[in-house]
Amino acid sequence: MSHALPIAAIATAPGRGGIGVVRVSGPRLDAYIRALLGRDLTPRHAHYLPFLAEDGERIDEGIAIYFQGPHSYTGEDVLELQGHGGPAVLKRLLARCLEAGRSLGMRLAEPGEFTRRAFLNDRMDLAQAEAVADLIEASSEAAARGAMASLSGEFSQRINDLSGRIVHLRMLVEATLDFPEEEIDFLEKYQARPTLDGLRQDLDTLIAQARQGIILREGLHVVLAGQPNVGKSSLLNALAGDDIAIVTPIAGTTRDKVVQEIFIDGVPLHIVDTAGLRETEDTVESIGIARTWKEIERADLILHLQDATAPGDILDVDITARLPARTPVLAVFNKIDLLTSTAQLAENSIGISAKQGLGLEELRARLLQMAGWNPGAESPWLARERHLHALQAARDHLDIAAEHASHDDRVLDLFAEELRLSHESLSSITGKFTSDDLLGEIFSSFCIGK
């Protein structure tokens, strides 16, 4: 168990609410609780009592619960005071908790410090700790379910299973190296090659699932780009199901970006409506157009809206030529309801009517397809970019190990080293091999009371 100094913080969100919670964590809080509340508390029981200032003035009244370590969130002794959720009351209650713990060196908790202590005290691994933040930040039911799956250990179990198999394979290599006089090829005897192939296949599956988990967690930055009056704002409103952006027949109405988050099959998409792209003498509109190009540069996907009644417009050709080659682009021809005959759209484009709602379901499906979302392979857990990088690194090291294993004159010490590096990459996901700098970066993104 950790022997760090005790910490305290308000654990509920800022603002007014029916209930507010102040949380304290530290080693051996029995005497502290007695001094703060004037009585002992039975662990894991709710006690209704007054919360008093040092001079006996009643600050509030509510429920006190004592969780004795190591059977607590942080693995240390934890005290939670549940009172009324007014900011002034909670600030006074927190100040009283810190005052009562002054002799113990109690201080205000840093962001994420309660969860960091839970990690350091082996109450959860690093992937589970990240899932706590993801659950708090989840903006859809699908994301919340994925975060809960990670928090319950489903992702970590997959990592630990792969790690265990790599360690076993490495043990066979070391045995072959350490006992050459036995004339036993442990790698051949225990079918090391099929084991290695199976590991690579399972890692491929895990990498694909991680990509799905990243999309579910982070969503995509989708920019609507095109000339003025091609229907970008109308499309934003149609996708959002609300009048988010102003729509008029006047060219140049949108002069700054408008961002709206929508969900398609639980996947968050951050749709950005932008100023129409054209040559203009208007200073304000020019600023908006410059911002549009900046948004285009940072987009995950670009919807290039064009007027279906004027295909092949020279300005659309110029815009297409300027769009970044590294970013997926979908040409969307709007106003198909105004066409008098069946028009032949450009290959790999889509026709819609934002005003009439035509083609929007196909557009939603194409957005998910271009994002790489596969509903049939939905990740049961959320993932982060660092998880994907670690999984890919582990896979790369196994590929190199396979090359060493395939040679007649196998270089077993290099084979063993690649297995070690693969195992280390996987272990960085759960925090068994993780730098202090990375831990600081992860936990600093938490709210203070968590």
Swiss-Prot record:
The keyword Hydrolase applies. Its cofactor is K(+). K(+) binds at N229, T248, I250, T253. One of its GO terms (cellular component) is cytosol. Residues 219-372 form the TrmE-type G domain. Mg(2+) binds at S233, T254. It holds the Pfam family TrmE_N. Binds 1 potassium ion per subunit. Its EC number is 3.6.-.-. It comes from the Bacteria. It is an enzyme of class 3 (hydrolase). Keywords: Cytoplasm, GTP-binding, Hydrolase, Magnesium, Metal-binding, Nucleotide-binding, Potassium, tRNA processing. SUPFAM superfamilies: P-loop containing nucleoside triphosphate hydrolases. GO terms for molecular function: GTP binding; GTPase activity; metal ion binding. GTP binds at residues 229-234, 248-254, 273-276. (6S)-5-formyl-5,6,7,8-tetrahydrofolate binds at R23, E80, R123, K450. It is found in: Cytoplasm. InterPro entries: G_TrmE, GTP-bd, GTP-bd_TrmE_N, GTPase_MnmE, MnmE_dom2, MnmE_helical, P-loop_NTPase, Small_GTP-bd. CDD domains: trmE (cd04164), TrmE_N (cd14858). GO terms for biological process: tRNA methylation; tRNA wobble uridine modification. Exhibits a very high intrinsic GTPase hydrolysis rate. Involved in the addition of a carboxymethylaminomethyl (cmnm) group at the wobble position (U34) of certain tRNAs, forming tRNA-cmnm(5)s(2)U34. Homodimer. Heterotetramer of two MnmE and two MnmG subunits. Belongs to the TRAFAC class TrmE-Era-EngA-EngB-Septin-like GTPase superfamily. TrmE GTPase family. HAMAP family: GTPase_MnmE. This is tRNA modification GTPase MnmE. The gene is mnmE.
